[in-house]
Regions:
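Extended catalytic cores of very large enzyme megasubunits
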Residues: 1-245
């Protein structure tokens, strides 16, 4: 086991959880919450639990070194020290969590962006289209990305389809599929983050809302209903609002 860890650390200095916490506590002027969050979420570590950074100065040096490596491909590159001073003490630039974890990280494949909005080009109401989105969502979440996508294109419950079922199951089963996929993905103790949305004029919009309110049904996603001006005018004027009959 020692030999394996020695190989995995690639000759880098390592720190215990307590060493990193105490150094970070000093960095954050006694703020225990900030120190714990930084050590647990953003300090460079490998899958064996080895910690390679003792405080954010080490992290900022890692970021500066990697950004400088890319800078050197172009004319008039910024030096590593210049970039470090811009990042140091979170003074001028505070990167998102994804970049703080992912840039220069040779132990983990991580996204360099926190959030993604995804969807298929063209028709995406087929089961194959739904599965494609599910796979794309999982791959992004594996890399610490949060994901959002819209379900307004899915045919409402009872719509005719050309398969053995003859009619569509509607939005709710697909909400559950995406929600379950999100709960199954965990990276460094973090569950995937998912936002699902639907237009208020979709015939299944009420079922969409009810699904989230049903205990244990859609626990892996936040949901959002997109409201249009016509709906708001109907509310203000106490009028009826008609949804689309088809998608």
């Amino acid at each position: 086991q020692y030999a394996m860890n020695e190989y995995e650390t690639k000759g880098k200095d390592t720190y215990t959880q307590e060493e990193a916490f105490q150094s970070s506590l000093n960095y954050f002027n006694g703020d225990e919450l900030a120190a714990r969050v930084w050590v647990n979420k953003y300090a460079l570590k490998d899958s064996y639990g080895n910690i390679f950074e003792k405080n954010p100065d080490d992290m900022h040096r890692r970021l500066a070194k990697e950004i400088s490596r890319i800078e050197n491909r172009y004319p008039n590159p910024l030096s590593e020290d210049t970039i470090f001073e811009v990042l140091r003490d979170f003074k001028y630039i505070v990167p998102q969590g994804g970049p703080m974890t992912g840039i220069g990280n040779e132990f983990q494949i991580a996204s360099l962006s926190n959030c993604f909005v995804i969807g298929n080009e063209g028709p995406s109401d087929s089961y194959g289209g739904v599965m494609k989105i599910d796979q794309e969502q999982v791959q992004l979440m594996k890399r610490r990305g949060g994901v959002g996508h819209d379900l307004s294109h899915i045919r409402p419950k009872g719509s005719p389809v050309k398969n053995s079922a003859l009619t569509s199951t509607g939005i709710v089963p697909f909400m559950e599929r995406y929600s379950n996929s999100t709960r199954e993905v965990a990276q460094d103790g973090r569950r995937g983050a998912l936002m699902l949305s639907v237009s208020i004029n979709h015939p299944d919009s009420e079922s969409f809302i009810d699904a989230k309110m049903t205990e244990g049904k859609v626990t892996g996603a936040n949901v959002s209903v997109k409201i249009d001006d016509e709906f708001m005018r109907a509310v203000i004027n106490d009028e009826e609002y008609e949804d689309r009959k088809s998608v």
